[in-house]
């Protein structure tokens, strides 16, 4: 599933497909005015019509919710949600729109997907814009994650300094999660590690406000 966003007088402009970060995150909704809404959208619409793709397994593109089958079956299903398959979906959409080339913007995981796109179908892209998602040269994954953890630690301290009451709130939530007393609307029990994963939004613009 993808939605097309354009200004009233911009329907003749070239296309830019946005490859969302994640993985596992749907594309942003242009009608939502929350702090996490992409600030670059207005600028992009000056030059392009924007294609917002819900990548496989997210949003309105057959979202992954309840696990189905045994572990091997689940693992096999997930092999169909990788960057290479997302690129094939992009190509299907490009052909459906009847265009020879379009530009692509890759954010975080979307940058890795864009790199795959450039490697596989360079003739389909007029331009590629990266805002993250490029592998470091000469550095191991452990080095990158160690640096990332330090950044998130600093972001967490900054968040609690800005919203001191949330430190107490999260401590209370962590205690409840440890007892198995927090559940999602679908009935899933929220464990402490899942609760802590909320902190990943602090790495995005407006993440502190969204988490608060």
What is each stretch, according to the model?
Residues 180-212:
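Alpha/beta-hydrolase fold active-site neighborhood
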């Amino acid at each position: 599933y993808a939605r097309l966003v354009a200004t009233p007088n911009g329907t003749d402009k070239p296309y830019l497909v946005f490859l969302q970060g994640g993985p596992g995150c749907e594309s942003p909704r242009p009608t939502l005015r929350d702090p996490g809404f992409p600030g670059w959208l207005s600028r992009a619409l000056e030059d392009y019509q924007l294609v917002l793709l819900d990548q496989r397994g997210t949003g309105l593109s057959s979202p992954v919710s309840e696990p189905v089958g045994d572990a091997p079956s689940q693992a096999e299903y997930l092999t169909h949600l990788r960057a290479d398959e997302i690129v094939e979906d992009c190509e299907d959409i490009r052909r459906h729109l009847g265009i020879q080339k379009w530009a692509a913007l890759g954010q975080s995981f979307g940058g890795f997907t864009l790199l795959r796109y450039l490697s596989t179908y360079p003739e389909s892209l007029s331009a590629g814009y990266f805002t993250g998602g490029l592998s470091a040269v000469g550095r191991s994954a452990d080095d990158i994650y160690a640096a990332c953890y330090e950044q998130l630690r600093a972001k967490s301290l900054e968040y609690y300094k800005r919203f001191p009451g949330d430190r107490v709130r999260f401590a209370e939530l962590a205690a409840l999660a440890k007892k198995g007393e927090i559940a999602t609307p679908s009935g899933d029990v929220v464990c402490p590690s899942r609760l802590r994963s909320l902190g990943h939004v602090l790495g995005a613009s407006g993440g502190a406000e969204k988490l608060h």
